[in-house]
Design a protein with these regions (language model features):
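Generic signature of intrinsically disordered, low-complexity segments enriched in small/polar residues
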Residues: 91-94, 152, 199, 412, ...
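Helix N-terminus capping/helix-initiation residues
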Residues: 20, 78-81, 101, 143, ...
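Gly/Ser/Thr/Ala-enriched C-terminal appendages of enzymes
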Residues: 2-72, 216-219, 223-224, 229, ...
Length: 492
């Protein structure tokens, strides 16, 4: 008997069926004579994430290259027609119990490419809520069904990288605001939000695409595959992402409950590198109030580039960093940052805020959210500390606790051509509160805050901010990660 382990699995997802079941039946439900279908992809609401005021365009090129080009070429067009048609018809018969000749699949295979045109906002630019970020339409009248057949694949591939890039952008903007208020310069900003999310993401692909979204605004990451993803689908002449040596609880506990020699051991392992040490495996406050003073001279003797970064990983996020005035001990009343100031000292910057000695620092990464980050930054400012004294390890609470509904992403058909006549179509449910109302007709994005709808294929769209990036199986406009980051930087 053959073992399942003996099967060579190239791909489990059938390229002609990268959709919801009901999509396979819509082809025969459209009006007779249908030729062209045009749809928009739009973030409709930020009600579930009101801090996301700007929605960053990101992930389109990677999606196109990975799926619309490579996946279809490798798993559909490069195989025999009989094989891909049989694969489709057998699956439909076995699951829906419907006879489907698969003629449309055969016709697509014979054509040899996806007859689709996609326009999108340049990656790295950000739009306001309700501004379309992408349009999709078929270019061959025999394949009107293909436009919205791809809806499911587009949504599942794009909502998360766009949402994560938008979150990273919002974090960076907020960190910039606190830096402008409390710091002399902004050199710390590219590293102040560090991606810790990989282990909490839903899949490796989620970690790659979301992690790449984080990297549009930051350089600090522990999600290694995100860097490889950017290299593969965008490329860059500059540093994409980086990290530093760091310990984890297994390391600390393996050395025993007396963590003073463990701190010293790790510092000796990395005498010339910045080093992050998780400090709460046994007794966080003992490490801060007893062990760090004993290590003070050794830490100060290290090169400035070999800063020791203290990482708390439990307790109340605010009181650990900023202190609790009701606590029973002085160190708990002060919090980590003030304790580090008492031990190592620092300087007062030109804006009157305290900056820790450059040999010591702190990172907090336990369940960080936007709201927690802001509260910590406000707490430090109130205590007279510059925002640069803290780095945030941003994990799955930030990047995985989202859905397509976080920004209300949807693809809706807004124009159809039947027997040569184009007409605007739309969705406007009377039972809806306005969220699900779609545009009408073709659209043109006139600014990153506004658009015009009600247009036809005959209207002048030469000034449309939506640019053609994919047409008839080819990527027709390429961007790189440096350009994306430049677009991002221009909006800070």
């Amino acid at each position: 008997m053959n073992s399942i382990l003996d099967k060579k699995i190239k791909s489990t997802a059938i390229p002609s069926l990268l959709c919801d079941f009901y999509k396979t039946l819509h082809r025969i439900q459209y009006p007779e004579g249908s030729q062209f279908l045009y749809s928009t992809f739009t973030p409709r609401s930020n009600a579930k994430a009101p801090f996301l005021h700007r929605i960053v365009s990101f992930g389109f090129q990677a999606f196109i290259m990975k799926y619309l080009i490579h996946y279809f070429n490798d798993n559909f067009f490069s195989r025999s027609e009989s094989e891909v048609v049989t694969e489709y018809t057998k699956f439909i018969a076995d699951t829906l119990h419907i006879e489907d000749s698969g003629e449309h699949i055969a016709q697509l295979h014979q054509l040899g490419y996806l007859p689709i045109r996609i326009k999108a906002i340049p990656e790295g630019k950000s739009v306001a809520i309700k501004v379309p970020m992408m349009t999709i339409e078929n270019t061959h009248p025999d394949f009107f069904w293909l436009t919205n057949y791809l809806e499911t694949l587009i949504n599942v591939s794009l909502w998360q990288p766009i949402t994560s890039a938008s979150i990273a952008f919002a974090y960076r903007k907020t960190l910039m605001q606190f830096s402008e208020q409390t710091c002399d310069d902004h050199r710390h900003l590219p590293f102040q939000s560090h991606d810790f999310s990989m282990r909490g993401m839903s899949s490796l692909e989620s970690a790659e695409t979301s992690g790449a979204g984080h990297l549009t605004s930051f350089l600090g990451t522990d999600t290694i595959p995100a860097i490889s993803f950017v290299e593969a689908y965008y490329g860059s002449k500059n540093l994409i992402g980086t990290s530093i040596p760091a310990s984890e609880h297994s390391v600390m506990s393996s050395h025993g409950v007396d963590e003073l020699p463990t701190f010293r051991y790790l510092m000796n392992k990395y005498p010339n590198n910045m080093l992050s040490i998780v400090a709460d495996t046994t007794d966080f406050w003992h490490n801060i109030t007893v062990n760090l003073p004993l290590l003070k001279e050794e830490i100060l003797a290290r090169p400035e580039s070999a800063k020791v970064v203290i990482r708390p990983d439990s307790g109340d996020f605010f009181t650990i960093i900023c202190g609790d005035v009701t606590a029973g001990t002085e160190h708990e009343r002060k919090g980590l940052i003030e304790c580090l100031w008492d031990i190592f000292g620092g300087t007062i910057n030109n804006k009157g805020y305290k900056v820790l000695n450059s040999h010591i620092g702190a990172i907090y990464g336990d369940g960080v959210t936007y709201e927690k980050m802001v509260k910590i930054l406000e707490g430090l400012e109130a205590k007279g500390f510059a925002s640069s004294n803290i780095v945030f390890g941003v994990g799955a609470q930030t990047y995985q606790r989202n859905t397509r509904d976080t920004l209300g992403f949807a693809i809706k058909a807004t124009s159809i051509t039947i027997n040569g006549a184009e007409k605007a179509i739309f969705k406007a449910p009377k039972t809806d509160d306005g969220l699900k109302k779609s545009q009408k007709g073709r659209v043109k994005v006139t600014t990153l805050e506004s658009y015009i709808d009600g247009l036809t294929a005959l209207d002048d769209c030469s000034d449309d901010l939506l640019e053609v990036i994919f047409e008839n199986g080819k990527l027709v406009k390429e961007t790189n990660f440096d350009e994306i980051r430049q677009n991002i930087a221009e909006q800070f």
